[in-house]
């Protein structure tokens, strides 16, 4: 988890006895705050179940995953500071996976998700789900640096999206979330 100027692995901050998927708003000067998934029309409990199902498809359990939602300028700053890359991106995954247990921080630029959705004529929620699972696929070891691995990543994203049995129960959720899910 990013706090101030240091990178702290989630496993050192959160209780190791609980499985947690957190949805947070990244703030580059303070600690992250809860992000209400309902604001973007997604049911956080169903999204967490889906993430766990996808992880299981690849032989992993879920430990602690933090999704940190930010804007383009914030993700650019993270990209420059920690990866020495000088470009905007939609997602950055910091992998703390141990054995077969997924752990990591996944930064997502909501600005880029919106523009990507418009560019490919997809809904915002569909593109956000694709990016959420893209980060999880990175935690399972999937790369996307070459044309071949990018094509494989896209195929796996589509397979993961197909796992959503009841899409309407995930999208268009009107409930309230504290931004933290504890899955036991």
Predicted regions: what they are:
Residues 2-128, 139-184:
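An acidic/histidine-cluster motif and surrounding catalytic segment
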């Amino acid at each position: 988890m990013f706090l101030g100027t240091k990178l702290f692995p989630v496993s050192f901050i959160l209780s190791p006895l609980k499985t947690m998927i957190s949805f947070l708003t990244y703030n580059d000067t303070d600690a992250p705050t809860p992000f209400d998934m309902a604001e973007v029309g997604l049911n956080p409990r169903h999204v967490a179940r889906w993430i766990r199902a996808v992880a299981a498809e690849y032989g992993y359990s879920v430990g602690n995953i933090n999704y940190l939602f930010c804007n383009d300028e914030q993700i650019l700053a993270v990209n420059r500071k920690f990866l020495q890359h000088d470009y905007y991106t939609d997602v950055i995954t910091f992998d703390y996976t141990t054995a077969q247990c997924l752990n990591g921080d996944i930064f997502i630029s909501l600005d880029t998700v919106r523009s990507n959705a418009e560019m490919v004529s997809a809904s915002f929620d569909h593109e956000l789900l694709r990016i959420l699972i893209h980060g999880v696929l990175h935690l399972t070891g999937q790369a996307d640096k070459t044309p071949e691995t990018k094509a494989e990543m896209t195929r796996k994203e589509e397979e993961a999206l197909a796992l959503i049995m009841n899409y309407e129960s995930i999208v268009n959720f009107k409930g309230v979330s504290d931004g933290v899910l504890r899955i036991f």
